[in-house]
């Protein structure tokens, strides 16, 4: 996010490390208390980070989608994570933080996110009734969403449509 600073970066790095080791474990085995503790801390850290640094394009999309469709917020965000990360990574001028996340996620954040989305059976946006004909309205509303202001790059209309298409 464009308003990130050292405190939010530290929270996010620790949260990412915990999610890497525990997200799938907690998903598969709710009795794994160590994994659940890690994920509880991830949730806490992410709340602290978003309160201080803002959100970005994932939530910029999720707000209008949630208002237009009966779609769970978390599932929508998860479906959008990899396409948004890929779009941002192509355009960001300072790669330092993106490279750090790549390292934390085994060298390629987009591949890790796509793989985790598949392993956790996260539905595509089309599962919630979203179709090609809805993309223009979603993109228009997303572009105006307050969450988009903290995205690390300004995404144009065509980029917003491409992200949505990839997540369909």
Residue ranges and their predicted role:
Residues 39-47, 81, 113, 117, ...:
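Short alpha-helical scaffolding segments that buttress acidic/His motifs in well-ordered protein cores
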Residues 11, 15, 57, 76-80:
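Catalytic-loop motifs flanking and including active-site residues across diverse enzymes
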Residues 13-17, 56, 92-93, 112-120, ...:
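Short acidic alpha-helix initiation/capping motifs at coil-to-helix transition points
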Residues 132-168:
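Short, amphipathic C-terminal "tail helix"
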Residues 44-77, 145-150:
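Glycine-rich phosphate/pyrophosphate-binding beta-alpha loops
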Residues 12, 36-39, 98, 135, ...:
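Hydrophobic packing residues in well-ordered alpha-helices of helical domains and bundles
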């Amino acid at each position: 996010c464009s308003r990130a600073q050292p405190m939010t970066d530290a929270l996010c790095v620790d949260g990412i490390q915990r999610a890497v080791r525990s997200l799938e474990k907690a998903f598969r085995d709710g009795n794994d208390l160590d994994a659940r503790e890690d994920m509880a801390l991830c949730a806490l850290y992410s709340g602290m980070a978003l309160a201080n640094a803002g959100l970005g394009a994932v939530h910029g999309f999720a707000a209008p989608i949630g208002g237009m469709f009966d779609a769970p917020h978390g599932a929508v965000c998860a479906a959008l994570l990899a396409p948004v990360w890929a779009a941002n990574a192509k355009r960001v001028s300072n790669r330092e933080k993106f490279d750090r996340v790549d390292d934390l996620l085994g060298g390629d954040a987009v591949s890790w996110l796509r793989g985790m989305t598949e392993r956790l059976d996260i539905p595509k946006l089309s599962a919630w009734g979203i179709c090609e004909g809805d993309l223009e309205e979603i993109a228009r509303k997303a572009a105006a969403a307050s969450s988009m202001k903290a995205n690390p790059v300004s995404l144009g209309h065509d980029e917003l449509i491409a992200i949505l298409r990839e997540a369909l």
